[in-house]
């Protein structure tokens, strides 16, 4: 059976951009006859708060989205579904990549990587050196095929879309596995077949498809993707938790209903099919 997923991060209260992504995901699931798995990406323990996890369940129920797999509340999530219970699996994947020579230890900041000033791979720093992250090398000649839910397939070069991503954080951040690795491992292991994302995550999709190739995760390489336009405010700025976008919690508590968000999600999806998609909220 086809399966898609909703995978929020509990680093703040959800906003309209999250809601529209969830609603588009639910509509895609309905159209292709897929189940929906709820996965809460909770590896970032420093920013996670219990009220943010509770907000995910409250928001999905307020939006009228039913899911067929995953936790029903915070306690069940912590007991049975937390990504922290999969650390051994992520370490197994890191070991495979390390043995294949796909990883290198890096002490550079994100800014240093973006300036292409990093020479850590050439210097072959030890993986157990202090204050290093483990990065995935993206070869300049690597190309991946992105299978779409709507439209034509794309061929993308991961290295042209992003610098080498961190797959394991520095020790000061708990040496924990990073988003790109956990996301592709979870999607592959959980049988996800359809993924809906904002277009700002196209680079992540390319990176994860290459990562799946290196890990032999063939199921992920067959996943179909839909990358929707970003949901912006009236000024054209992307909605985000860090910028204080109006929360769904605030909407619920003020007595608002999600009808306008549902209509906007359907308009956006119809626009994508017709090639005219735009999305902003007042």
List the predicted regions and their residue ranges:
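Active-site cores that bind ATP or allylic diphosphates and position pyrophosphate for catalysis
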Residues: 105-240, 247-252, 273
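Non-catalytic terminal extensions that flank enzyme cores
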Residues: 1-13, 31, 36, 63, ...
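Short C-terminal domain-edge/linker segments immediately following a structured domain
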Residues: 67-71, 169, 212-215, 226, ...
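Alpha-helical context
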Residues: 1-5, 32-36, 70-74, 79, ...
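N-terminal Rossmann-like or analogous alpha/beta NTP/dinucleotide-binding catalytic cores
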Residues: 1-117, 199-211, 215-220, 271-275
């Amino acid at each position: 059976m086809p399966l898609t997923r909703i995978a929020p991060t509990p680093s703040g209260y959800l906003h309209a951009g999250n809601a529209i992504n969830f609603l588009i995901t639910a509509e895609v699931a309905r159209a292709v006859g897929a189940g929906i798995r709820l996965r809460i990406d909770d590896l970032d323990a420093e920013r996670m708060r219990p009220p943010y996890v509770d907000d995910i369940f409250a928001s999905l129920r307020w939006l009228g989205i039913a899911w067929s797999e995953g936790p029903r509340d915070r306690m069940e999530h912590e007991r049975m579904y937390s990504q922290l219970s999969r650390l051994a699996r992520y370490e197994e994947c890191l070991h495979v990549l390390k043995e294949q020579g796909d990883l290198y230890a890096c002490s550079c900041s994100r800014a240093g990587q973006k300036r292409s000033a990093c020479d850590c791979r050439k210097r072959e720093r030890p993986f157990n050196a202090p204050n290093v992250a483990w990065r995935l090398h993206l070869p300049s000649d690597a190309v991946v095929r992105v299978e779409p839910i709507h439209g034509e397939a794309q061929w993308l070069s991961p290295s042209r879309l992003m610098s080498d991503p961190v797959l394991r954080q520095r020790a000061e951040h708990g040496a924990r596995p990073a988003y790109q690795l956990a996301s592709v491992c979870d999607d592959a292991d959980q049988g996800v077949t359809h993924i809906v994302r904002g277009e700002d995550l196209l680079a992540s999709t390319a990176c994860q498809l290459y990562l799946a190739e290196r890990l032999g995760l063939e199921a992920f390489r067959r996943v179909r993707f839909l990358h929707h336009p970003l949901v912006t405010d009236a000024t054209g700025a992307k909605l985000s938790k860090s910028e204080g976008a109006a929360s769904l919690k605030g909407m619920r508590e003020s007595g608002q209903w999600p009808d306008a968000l549902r209509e906007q999600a359907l308009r956006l999806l119809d626009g994508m099919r017709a090639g005219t998609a735009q999305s902003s909220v007042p």
